[in-house]
Amino acid sequence: MPSFDIVSEVDLQEARNAVDNASREVESRFDFRNVEASFELNDASKTIKVLSESDFQVNQLLDILRAKLLKRGIEGSSLDVPENIVHSGKTWFVEAKLKQGIESATQKKIVKMIKDSKLKVQAQIQGDEIRVTGKSRDDLQAVMAMVRGGDLGQPFQFKNFRD
């Protein structure tokens, strides 16, 4: 029986490349001359720390980072940015978290959405991914289109497509 897995993963190497590209752009931009502004990627906690001298500049840096992530194939919705910007001494910073895996509430929404579609497929939650199986390849492709079209707050990838 054909099946596939729905996952939400961020390639950390591509994220590192995007952070490096954003750092290079900040070094060459005129509005960031003589300003302490930086990006730091922490592989262990999967966070990106954005640091600058004012809250306005932190927001500009986040826009640059989102653009560079998008160029590297990582959607902006995979970056979880908290609302509050922390002020410490003379610097402002924010720690944006890269979303890895699908949360259980989102998993339940996806499974409910698949079951409500009345397609002849089964969806099973397996850890932080969802396995979808069905008899028809067309039904599985319809599920893929439905998950892509649904506004669930994070990007999804499909892997392990088997016949």
UniProtKB/Swiss-Prot annotation:
HAMAP family: YajQ. Monomer. GO terms for biological process: DNA damage response; response to hydrogen peroxide. Keywords: ATP-binding, GTP-binding, Nucleotide-binding. GO terms for molecular function: ATP binding; GTP binding; nucleotide binding; tRNA binding. GO terms for cellular component: cytosol. This is Nucleotide-binding protein YajQ. Pfam families: DUF520. Belongs to the YajQ family. It comes from Escherichia coli (strain K12). Nucleotide-binding protein. Binds ATP, GTP and tRNA. It comes from the Bacteria. Composed of two domains, each centered on a beta-sheet, connected by two helical segments.
